Swiss-Prot record:
GO terms for biological process: tRNA wobble position uridine thiolation. Disulfide bonds join C107-C205. It catalyses: S-sulfanyl-L-cysteinyl-[protein] + uridine(34) in tRNA + AH2 + ATP = 2-thiouridine(34) in tRNA + L-cysteinyl-[protein] + A + AMP + diphosphate + H(+). This is tRNA-specific 2-thiouridylase MnmA. It comes from Shewanella baltica (strain OS155 / ATCC BAA-1091). Keywords: ATP-binding, Cytoplasm, Disulfide bond, Nucleotide-binding, RNA-binding, Transferase, tRNA processing, tRNA-binding. ATP binds at G16, M17, S18, G19, G20, V21, D22, S23, M42, G132.
Amino acid sequence: MTSIEPTHTGKKVIVGMSGGVDSSVSAYLLMQQGYQVEGLFMKNWEEDDNNEYCAAAEDLKDAQAVCDKLGIKLHTVNFAAEYWDNVFEYFLAEYKAGRTPNPDIMCNKEIKFKAFLEFADEILDADYIAMGHYVRRRDNSDGSTQMLRGVDGNKDQSYFLYTLSHEQVARSLFPVGELEKHEVREIAKEMGLITHDKKDSTGICFIGERKFTEFLGTYLPAQPGNIETPEGEVIGTHQGLMYHTLGQRKGLGIGGMKNSNDDPWYVVDKDLERNVLIVGQGGHHPRLMSTGMTVNQLHWVDRTGPVDGCHIAVKTRYRQQDVPCTLTYTDEHTLGVVFDEPVAAVTPGQSAVFYDGEVCLGGGIIDQLIRG
């Protein structure tokens, strides 16, 4: 492996150590660059079953093993109260209102780059924080800092970080954003880090791998109702609108319908007033397609957003191909977006994130869909 010439001697970085390979390699790379590195493990959820407790304990054990191997300190902190108040209650309120939120985005905003940064500043006297996210930062000659997509297009996580402020980006380092995932695993293996072959975590941010329906049902009462076609024919029942999202195909329990073709059924709409789930056949059903949307709760990383009438790219969900679009401001908090071509399964409550080439500009929450 090519050694990196140390260039940042003395600057202190607190790395969010999750017990995964990305944060492990981030800590190693920053040490190679000459930073004074310490780790911080966050506990953000009070586990309520043995499986979750064991998984969290395993993550902490792995984080400690990596820090021991690298010869750095590992601190721990409990942000469970902040997570509940600022992330989880929002998550439940959105589901209750019939929308589909993205808790990972709120978790990054409120916990990883707010509570974590404040703790690193006030308690650990950090110059920077670092996370194992696949994004990059660019420091421009005019003093501004921009957030760029990660080099690994399949792992790029800028969609989840669009709510970061200019100041938060300027205080954060993202070492693995310059690498492909396979390179990160190779570095971890070469360094003998225990996390080199640990599988990536999935599931809700910090809550972990659970059966989502059961988990949500413990916090929100389910309200069963009918499943109907767009024409109003009742063809089944659902256990609760909150368990379904636009474009969903699996788990509908519909099949073998008389007088219907073999095309799969998709969720194409929700009627909140009647508690009815509306389904149609085919992934490009007209009710599933949108020609545009309104976006509110706008946030721009570099403080000033794109100009009115500009033509840029948007993602309405993670890992989606860029969608070319034109923007029109209704006011400073709301944006009208018209897609160049209709887009399937645009979902209220999810985030719309805008890009100018490699630069993540910011985004907002999808509010209303424009159809036809």
